[in-house]
Amino acid sequence: AQGGTNVSGGQRQRLCIARMFVADPKVYVFDDSFSALDATTEANLNAAMREIVQDRTVIVVAQKVSSIKHADQILVMEAGRIVARGTHDELLQTSETYREIAASQAEVDA
């Protein structure tokens, strides 16, 4: 990129995420930070994150199930209210809202 001005949205997101890992905070907050990443990059990042942030608190705000399906706890919100809480597998069993979201993104069996 020319002076850093010619980067794509996905490249910009990867740079911001890399800066956060270098800073090594006790709490990581990702607010829809993976939306511009392709599926392969997102999967690689999620795998690396699980190792890097083992002893840290990680909060992920996401619309993509693939971004949060390995989380210890997922909060499902609808109309500004928490309507379900659990792991990916638990929510597939207990939350119609989560099942619908996962099915619409083809994440039911993944």
Question: What residue ranges belong to the model's regions?
Answer:
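Hydrophobic anchor residue at the start of the ABC signature
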Residues: 17, 61
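Active-site beta3 strand of CheY-like receiver
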Residues: 29
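ABC ATPase nucleotide-binding domain helices that frame the ATP-binding cleft
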Residues: 15-16, 22
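Conserved catalytic loops of ABC-family nucleotide-binding domains
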Residues: 51-60
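C-terminal portion of ABC ATPase nucleotide-binding domains
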Residues: 4, 32, 40, 47, ...
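Conserved ABC ATPase nucleotide-binding domain "signature" region
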Residues: 2-5, 11-14, 40-43
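A short, proline-enriched helix->beta-strand linker immediately N-terminal to the Walker B motif
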Residues: 22-26, 55
